[in-house]
Amino acid sequence: MVKIRLTRGGAKKRPFYHIIVTDVRSARDGRNIERLGYYNPVAQGAEPRVVLDVARVDHWVGQGAQLTDKVRNLYREASKSQAAAA
């Protein structure tokens, strides 16, 4: 089964997450199929908090991929921000 989930990066006490497509059997920071965007929970000022390729997420969901709860919330946030920007 394929999931769209977060993988952690960044430094100690400065988390940064990549939003990836991966097999459920892979480790959290292990091998991925495709990188779809990123999530920066400690963004400041004009830095974007969520950058996500919504079209690719729709593609993978159409192929049967499942989103984790956090990624589902980030997807909604990214969709709203893209709609507001357009």
Swiss-Prot record:
Xref: Gene3D superfamilies: 3.30.1320.10
InterPro entries in UniProt: Ribosomal_bS16 (IPR000307), Ribosomal_bS16_CS (IPR020592), Ribosomal_bS16_dom_sf (IPR023803)
UniProt superkingdom: Bacteria
Cellular component aspect of the GO annotation: cytoplasm; small ribosomal subunit
Keywords tagged on the record: Ribonucleoprotein, Ribosomal protein
UniProt keyword Ribosomal protein present: yes
GO BP annotation list: translation
GO molecular function: structural constituent of ribosome
Disulphide linkage map: none
Family recorded in the similarity comment: Belongs to the bacterial ribosomal protein bS16 family.
Protein name: Small ribosomal subunit protein bS16
Organism: Xanthomonas campestris pv. campestris (strain ATCC 33913 / DSM 3586 / NCPPB 528 / LMG 568 / P 25)
Organism ancestry: Bacteria, Pseudomonadati, Pseudomonadota, Gammaproteobacteria, Lysobacterales
